[in-house]
UniProtKB/Swiss-Prot annotation:
Family: Belongs to the universal ribosomal protein uS19 family.
High-level lineage: Bacteria, Pseudomonadati, Pseudomonadota, Gammaproteobacteria, Alteromonadales
Any one annotated GO CC term: cytoplasm
Signal sequence, renumbered to the chain: none
GO molecular function terms listed in the Swiss-Prot or TrEMBL record: rRNA binding; structural constituent of ribosome
Coiled coil: none
Species the sequence originates in: Idiomarina loihiensis (strain ATCC BAA-735 / DSM 15497 / L2-TR)
Protein name per its UniProtKB record: Small ribosomal subunit protein uS19
Length: 92
């Protein structure tokens, strides 16, 4: 269920402060964050945000189509390697 419109988007305060500092300084260095729950806002367009996936920080370049989505949606946490192959079928 989506968040109520009267509440507005959620973004962690420490991440918002980092975004504002990067915009003022004009830095292109990735912003490291562990806040996967924060929503992408229009101020983040053009920035690279390194989102933690539990093991490493995944760089996410923010575009205008991403506004309204959460940062965690763009940093997958699970790696799928496929099911094990059937050994009987390989021998034939």
């Amino acid at each position: 269920m989506p968040r109520s419109l009267k509440k507005g988007p959620f973004i962690d305060l420490h991440l918002l402060n980092k975004v504002e500092k990067a915009l003022e300084a004009g830095e292109k260095k990735p912003i490291k964050t562990w806040s996967r729950r924060s929503m992408i806002i229009p101020d983040m367009i053009g920035l690279t945000i390194a989102v933690h996936n539990g093991r490493q920080h995944v760089p996410v370049y923010v575009t205008d189509e991403m506004i309204g989505h959460k940062l965690g949606e763009f940093a997958p946490t699970r790696t799928y390697r496929g099911h094990a192959a059937d050994k009987k079928a390989k021998k034939r």
